[in-house]
């Protein structure tokens, strides 16, 4: 089944085919809330759950391939940032109203 999201933060813009952004790993596909923005070359992988009003910017990667990642509401993951988890040891949790800066690495 194809998934679509609206491009543009809280705006009605063109539809983007999300199959290129959302990668299923071990039968887990990223989930996200309403009013989220994903840049065209951002990537979300595996066991990722993201709240409402979030944004993932250019070349940012959220890797839930080895453990879960939980992201709250109103989170901004800026350009080039990487969010990851530790293999079979610790998940990554990001609360509400958080901004992850440009090129930052967040590792659970």
Predicted ranges, named:
Residues 34, 39-40, 45-46, 51-52, ...:
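Left-handed beta-helix
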Residues 69:
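A short, polar/charged loop-to-alpha-helix boundary motif
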Residues 21-26:
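N-terminal charged helix/coil linker that caps or initiates catalytic domains
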């Amino acid at each position: 089944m194809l998934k679509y999201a609206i491009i543009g933060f809280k705006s009605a813009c063109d539809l983007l085919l999300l199959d290129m952004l959302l990668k299923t790993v071990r039968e887990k596909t990223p989930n996200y809330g309403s009013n989220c923005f994903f840049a065209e070359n951002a990537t979300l992988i595996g066991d990722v759950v993201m709240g409402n009003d979030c944004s993932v910017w250019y070349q940012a990667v959220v890797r839930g391939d080895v453990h879960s990642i939980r992201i709250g509401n109103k989170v901004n993951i800026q350009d080039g940032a990487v969010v990851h988890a530790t293999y079979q040891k610790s998940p990554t949790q990001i609360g509400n109203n958080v901004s992850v800066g440009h090129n930052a690495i967040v590792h659970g």
